[in-house]
Amino acid sequence: MKDKLIPEIINRKSSLTFSDEKITIDEIQILIESIKWAPSSRNMQPWKVIFVSKESTSYKSLFNSLSESNQEWASNCTLYAVFCVEDDKRLNKKFLDVGYAGQNLMLQSERLKIDTHPMGGWDEDKVKKSLKIPNENHVVFILAMGKKGSPDKLNVNLKERHDKERTRNPNEENFSFDIWKFN
């Protein structure tokens, strides 16, 4: 069944290694376009995305805002995409829309041969301060991005994670028909 899926879904993997090769402005424009076309409740398009390149003065402070486990590998990426939404009563729908936008970005990145790794670990206050994000906004997730790097540069633990086969749960663990049938 897997062979029926588009290759970007199958090939996308959370990379732990990136090369020094820059993502071009033309590639970033294509990625922005992919985000714009994400599904969105009532076409609100609530996402605010800040791209931070390695050359940016904000790069180091953003990196220092990440959790230790993310800092272990994320220093090699050449671009971060920081997804935010404004806080209000529709926050749940906005988070869902940001998820769609992020998935579009990751799949389009895969098509462009840009590796990605979504992160959920950071210090919210530090990220907001380093990128001047207003307090009434939430950082939903941060995506590390870059061209494919060499796994030979990884330490033993990261190399093991990098080489680990991507697996998925058996269908019965996550899917049922008609009624709840999960343990």
Region locations from a protein language model:
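Acidic, surface-exposed loops and disordered segments
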Residues: 1-183
